[in-house]
């Protein structure tokens, strides 16, 4: 959004809700619970991902495989298939949770209207249906409420997608007005960082490296840093606090 970058579904959902509050992503007023589901959906995704990797990674073109290995450095692509039965059981266990939630006849996971919960859950069911339809049929067997929900999700469509290349994205950030962010540091935060400290923000569940910048926001739900890069100029990058590690830069 201009010269601000929002990382992870948790923050993207909150920003979308702020910019476009109607229709709400949280129609039942349960934003905290639904945002917590983002972390659950990470585990659902992991089960689907490892099933697909174990069955198909050897068939991918080498450049694409290398790219995926860089994206998921904590997964050993050569051996992930050894535990295929375990990951299939995990996927089915996650899918059972959806079936259970829908078993009272509700149309959507949070009730009468679609919400962030549906957005968080559906992609991994669709991923399995698309990549491994025969396996998906077995893994989702007997989940009739989930199957009906899938059709409702598909009936909503996917909106209008606008493609943008990386050079255009960089140019948009450079051209955006400088971001004025009020310094907002939680006095009760256990790490006791102060505003202006050079920090690294990185996912706490992978080793993909982090982003370095000047700390401007540190709250229970968010950390934001200001950084300057020749490709994009000066930007403020926002991360969720949940699932991200903040440490002093070397």
Role assignments for model-derived ranges:
Residues 25-33, 160-171:
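Short, flexible loop/turn segments with low-complexity composition
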Residues 1-70, 78, 193, 200-203, ...:
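GST-like domain detector, emphasizing the conserved glutathione-binding G-site
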Residues 39-155:
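GST-like fold's C-terminal all-alpha helical module
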Residues 95-98, 173-178, 199-202:
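Short linear motifs at secondary-structure transitions and domain/linker junctions
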Residues 162-195:
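Mixed-charge, Lys/Arg-rich low-complexity intrinsically disordered regions
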Residues 113, 124, 165-169, 204:
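Histidine- and/or cysteine-centered catalytic micro-motif in compact active-site loops
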């Amino acid at each position: 959004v201009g010269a601000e970058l929002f990382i992870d579904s948790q923050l993207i959902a909150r920003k979308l809700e702020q910019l476009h509050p109607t229709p709400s992503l949280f129609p039942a007023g349960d934003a905290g619970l639904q945002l917590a589901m983002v972390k659950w959906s990470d585990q659902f995704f992991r089960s689907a991902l490892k099933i697909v990797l174990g069955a198909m990674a050897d068939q991918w073109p080498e450049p694409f495989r290398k790219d995926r290995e860089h994206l998921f450095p904590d997964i050993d692509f050569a051996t992930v298939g050894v535990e295929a039965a375990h990951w299939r059981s995990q996927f089915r266990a996650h899918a059972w949770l959806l079936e259970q939630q829908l078993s009272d006849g509700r149309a959507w996971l949070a009730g009468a209207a679609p919400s962030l919960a549906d957005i968080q859950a559906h992609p991994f069911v669709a991923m399995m249906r698309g990549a491994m339809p025969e396996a998906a049929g077995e893994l989702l067997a007997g989940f009739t409420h989930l199957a009906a929900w899938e059709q409702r999700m598909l009936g909503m469509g996917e909106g209008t997608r606008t493609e943008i290349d990386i050079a255009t994205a960089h140019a948009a950030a450079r051209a955006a007005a400088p971001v004025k962010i009020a310094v907002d540091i939680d006095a009760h935060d256990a790490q006791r960082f102060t505003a202006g400290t050079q920090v690294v923000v990185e996912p706490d569940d992978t080793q993909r490296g982090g982003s370095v910048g000047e700390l401007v926001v540190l709250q229970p739900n968010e950390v934001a840093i200001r950084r300057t890069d020749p490709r994009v100029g000066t930007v403020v990058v926002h991360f969720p606090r949940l699932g991200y590690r903040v440490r002093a830069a070397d």
